């Protein structure tokens, strides 16, 4: 069936990902070469930096769909939602952009500032039948060397580790955290977070590390079975 990638910035001209249509196609080529058959496109929703109009996002999705060929992964629209003032307003109005057709949505938080009441809000999301998905948990300083908090958040949230971090490309501290989450069984899935073609080369190194250290069954679980569970609204064990 192939891999399912929950996090990427393939759509051109909406954030810090692909700058133009050719770059989007180059990313699709590289994603296909990595073995990905379903690609979630998750443009930033970040008030301080990237907040593209949703009509523009949808038009860019249509444009990339028109460029996509049979060899490329299918596309599913989502968003990478920064936990900021806009996110709080969207909680109140129930307007958080989800992975299309699912109860799951991707979130990120500031690296050095855990949002107040985050654990309680994650619980509320789950009680409402929603599945929050935390992007790159290895980046968040408050989770470093804090297993109690890490496990508390993990109870109501799917952790999706960046493959580039696993491969050691995002810093030594992030690599240590990413690998610990995998080895301790706290990572639900892995993703590329691809912004450019070079990110896929880093992702391949991360996959090779998982294959060597944890076995190929772990690669399949983290990059195929678990992402499909998440898109079905299920929190993987």
Kindly give the residue locations of the regions a language model identified:
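Active-site environment of divalent metal-dependent phosphoester hydrolases
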Residues: 46-49, 82-84, 139-143, 166-169, ...
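Extended substrate/RNA-proximal surfaces in nucleic-acid metabolism proteins
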Residues: 51-160
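Short acidic/histidine-rich active-site segments
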Residues: 186-202
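An N-terminally biased module of ancient metal coordination in phosphate/nucleic-acid-related enzymes
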Residues: 1-71
